[in-house]
């Protein structure tokens, strides 16, 4: 028996609300899923962003003053010259992860002053 999607869609269009409700319940029971789960996940994600207290500082681009950006990255991260240069050359890259909002803003200001483009995530 071949599955004909057009026929299934046509049947769904003709079904009443009660029949569609029964169909959803049957699918939930048969496959062990719920129709409400994606909506709850989206709502939880939005609430999490509103109360976000830690950020990742991402170097999006080094800009024209690459040497100054490398120096700033070394100062902020404590990395050696080679590692800091590799991080700057590999942009976009995370400079620091899971930092407080105030510290993230300070890091962003230092790096932007050095000529970098920064994104807080």
Curated annotation (Swiss-Prot):
User: Which N-terminal stretch is annotated as signal sequence?
Assistant: none
SUPFAM superfamilies (alphabetical): ClpS-like (SSF54736), Ribosomal protein L7/12, oligomerisation (N-terminal) domain (SSF48300)
Cellular component GO terms, alphabetical? cytosolic large ribosomal subunit
Please name the InterPro entries in this protein's record. Answer: Ribosomal_bL12 (IPR000206), Ribosomal_bL12_C (IPR013823), Ribosomal_bL12_C/ClpS-like (IPR014719), Ribosomal_bL12_oligo (IPR008932), Ribosomal_bL12_oligo_N_sf (IPR036235)
Q: Which Pfam families match?
A: Ribosomal_L12 (PF00542), Ribosomal_L12_N (PF16320)
Q: Which domain of life is it from?
A: Bacteria
Alphabetical keyword list: Ribonucleoprotein, Ribosomal protein
Quaternary form? Answer: Homodimer. Part of the ribosomal stalk of the 50S ribosomal subunit. Forms a multimeric L10(L12)X complex, where L10 forms an elongated spine to which 2 to 4 L12 dimers bind in a sequential fashion. Binds GTP-bound translation factors.
Q: What does this chain do?
A: Forms part of the ribosomal stalk which helps the ribosome interact with GTP-bound translation factors. Is thus essential for accurate translation.
Q: What is this protein called?
A: Large ribosomal subunit protein bL12
Natural source organism: Streptococcus uberis (strain ATCC BAA-854 / 0140J)
């Amino acid at each position: 028996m071949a599955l004909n999607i057009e026929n299934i869609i046509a049947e769904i269009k003709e079904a009443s609300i009660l029949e569609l409700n029964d169909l959803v319940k049957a699918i939930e029971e048969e496959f062990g899923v719920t129709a409400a789960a994606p909506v709850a996940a989206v709502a939880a994600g939005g609430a999490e962003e509103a109360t976000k207290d830690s950020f990742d500082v991402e170097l999006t681009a080094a800009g024209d003053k690459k040497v100054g950006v490398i120096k700033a990255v070394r100062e902020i991260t404590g990395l050696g010259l080679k590692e800091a240069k590799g991080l700057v050359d590999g942009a976009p890259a995370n400079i620091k992860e899971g930092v407080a909002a105030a510290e993230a803003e300070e890091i962003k200001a230092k790096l932007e002053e050095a000529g970098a483009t920064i994104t807080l995530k």
